[in-house]
Amino acid sequence: MEVKIFRVKGTFEKGGKKFRFTKEYRALKPEDVRELVFSDIGSKHRVKRAKIFIESIEEIEPVEAENLVVKRLSLELA
């Protein structure tokens, strides 16, 4: 199986306010990315999974990645 890059867009609620986010992850499948988002945002912002709303998970090419760590890892290993 090949590791792919995914871009995730969504929102989360904290303290009655909504915050938008865009994250990029390396994973095998979209289901893995979904769990990474819940884990990452939940731990950093102390938000429950029910307050995290994922709008889209899209697969992108390594050159499209904005996160430099994800981009370099993907280009070096390709």
Curated annotation (Swiss-Prot):
GO biological process: translation
Cross-referenced Pfam families: Ribosomal_L18A
Gene Ontology CC entries for this record: ribonucleoprotein complex; ribosome
Stored SUPFAM superfamilies: RplX-like
InterPro entries, sorted: Ribosomal_eL20, Ribosomal_eL20_dom
Keywords: Ribonucleoprotein, Ribosomal protein, RNA-binding, rRNA-binding
Molecular function per GO: large ribosomal subunit rRNA binding; structural constituent of ribosome
NCBIfam families associated with the record: PRK00773.1-1 (NF001981)
Complex and partners: Part of the 50S ribosomal subunit. Binds 23S rRNA.
Family stated for the protein in its record: Belongs to the eukaryotic ribosomal protein eL20 family.
Protein name: Large ribosomal subunit protein eL20
Organism: Thermococcus sibiricus (strain DSM 12597 / MM 739)
Gene name per UniProt: rpl18a
